Curated annotation (Swiss-Prot):
Record's function text: Catalyzes the NADPH-dependent reduction of N-acetyl-5-glutamyl phosphate to yield N-acetyl-L-glutamate 5-semialdehyde.
InterPro entries in the cross-refs: AGPR_AS, AGPR_type-1, NAD(P)-bd_dom_sf, NAGSA_dehydrogenase, Semialdehyde_DH_NAD-bd
Name of protein: N-acetyl-gamma-glutamyl-phosphate reductase
HAMAP family for this protein: ArgC_type1
GO biological process: one example: L-arginine biosynthetic process
Family under the similarity heading: Belongs to the NAGSA dehydrogenase family. Type 1 subfamily.
Gene Ontology CC annotation, any one: cytoplasm
Enzyme active site: C150
Length: 346
């Protein structure tokens, strides 16, 4: 059995890790880390775990944890993992970081967008960007995984085949994104109170959202060009889910059949990416609670643009599910182990 420790197990992504890993045949969770609930029973924090998890929460001591487990998941705010990472830790244990600390390779870019100093830049080169559909072989050999952000995961998977094939102009990409409130985390914030978000939609982080450089860096690596995008996220009054609607200018006229063949070719062997049939726009309700990403597209010949769409659960494929997918690859397990979660409806 793989011994797992979770730092930040009482956040939304951390709790989702617990839910998924409890169903995993090859895993034993031995450390429920939480600086907010030290010594409190996990099931007292999340009553859905009553009579399922009887263990208590430990502190977030990563050095101590590395002595007891095979892999550590850090479901923590930006800055934590980078502040405690050492070669000694990585020599003992694999680490999957769900924060942004190792996603962006350029230290200056990270510090500029996140507004904090990066405390372990020496590990940036080694860290593997954990988008399994593209970096599978590197993930298998990795000690340190940078689990991708939720918006970048949905955006990249929705757009990747067409940007890779040179179908769209790389300087024309506009991404309109919408997310449920769980994407903002479990911490108490006035902006996330019920009366603030109910019956309301709003754009936020307009032109300044931190996931922008992550998406741009990945597209730049794909195209070997300096790609700049317009990315605007919106908060919508639902618990979970992400919906992406992206726009790109076509380099030439293409038919529906040509584009559909490209998507099918890229994703036919990818269990978790579902290319929908013509006229079926992705919806968040059809992926809720699952590790699936549903993608589709529409060609608008009138404007010479293509509209690319994607939907996924921000806490599963956008966080915990993708992290478990990475763990499976790192330990030579079937990639779908513990992740064949049927979407919940209604």
């Amino acid at each position: 059995m793989i011994k797992v420790g979770i730092i930040g197990s009482t956040g939304y992504a951390g709790q989702e890790l617990v839910r998924i890993l409890l169903q995993h045949k090859e895993v034993s969770i031995v450390w429920y880390g939480s600086k907010s609930y030290i010594d409190k029973k996990y099931s007292e924090v999340f009553q859905n775990m009553f009579q399922i998890v009887e263990e208590s929460c430990f502190d977030d001591n990563m050095e101590e944890l590395a002595r007891h487990v095979d892999v550590i998941f850090t479901a923590t705010p930006q800055g934590f993992c980078a502040s405690v990472m050492t070669e000694d830790i990585l020599s003992k244990v694999k680490v999957i970081d769900l924060s942004a600390d190792y996603r962006i390779k350029d230290v200056k870019t990270y510090e500029e967008w996140y507004g904090i100093k990066h405390n372990s830049p020496d590990f940036l080169k080694e860290a593997v960007y954990g988008l399994c559909e593209f970096n599978r072989e590197d993930i298998k050999k990795a000690r340190l995984i940078a689990n991708p952000g939720c918006y970048p995961t949905c955006s990249i998977l929705s757009i990747y085949p067409l940007i890779k094939e040179g179908i769209i102009e790389t300087d024309s990409i506009i991404i309109d994104a919408k997310s449920g409130v769980s994407g903002a985390g479990r911490g108490a914030k006035v902006d996330n109170l019920y009366c603030e978000v109910n019956e309301n939609m709003k754009a936020y982080g307009v032109s300044t959202h931190r996931h922008t450089p992550e998406i741009e860096e990945q597209f730049s690596l794909i195209t070997l060009e300096n790609v700049t995008i317009n990315f605007t996220p919106h908060l919508v009054p639902m618990n979970r889910g992400i919906l992406i609607t992206a726009y790109g200018k076509l380099k030439k006229r293409v038919s529906y059949e040509e584009v559909k063949e490209i998507y099918d070719r890229y994703y036919e062997k990818e269990y978790f990416v579902r290319v929908l049939e013509k006229g079926m726009p992705p919806e968040t309700r059809w992926v809720e609670g699952s590790n699936f990403v549903d993608v589709n597209f529409v060609i608008d010949n009138r404007t010479n643009r293509i509209i690319m769409m994607g939907a996924m659960d921000n806490l599963v494929k956008g966080a915990a599910g993708q992290a478990v997918q990475n763990m499976n690859l790192m330990f030579g397990l079937p990639e779908q182990e513990g992740l064949k979660l049927v979407p919940m409806f209604p």
